[in-house]
Amino acid sequence: MIEFKDICKHFQGTTALDHVSFTAESGQITALLGQNGAGKSTLMKILTGAYQKDSGEIRIDGRSVNITDPNAAEALGIGIVYQELSGMPHLTVSENIVIGRDPVRHGFLDFKKQREIARQMLNRLGASDIDVDQRLGELSVSQQQICEIAKCMAEEPKIV
């Protein structure tokens, strides 16, 4: 379970979040809906450590947490898939899915394991038709977004 209590965030005199509070229960899908500029992305960037909150509290499984940067969020098991694509179009699908966590065997990149991980993640998402050896930039935008989700899932987060 994740709880947001009275989260506030200001940018140069503009209030982005004004005492936002809500709870997302474990095992459930929670959607944030709102107009452009309502603060949805700001709240997610606070959760993932890209922004710091000005005030308020975030609790995960009843424990207050201080998410100071993206590494702290990752250590807490928080993963995110932004709507903007961030993949490397010149790399393969498998390289994109495991980038930063590349499997190594005997001191060398293990490309077989890399492909295996990518296939497993895509299969979990029902996207076994995506070729892990294809360059990401050759895929449709929707397929690239599926690869972004697979990359997040490969990190085995507790919270997505």
Predicted regions and their residues:
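Glycine-rich phosphate-binding loops of nucleotide-dependent enzymes
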Residues: 1-160
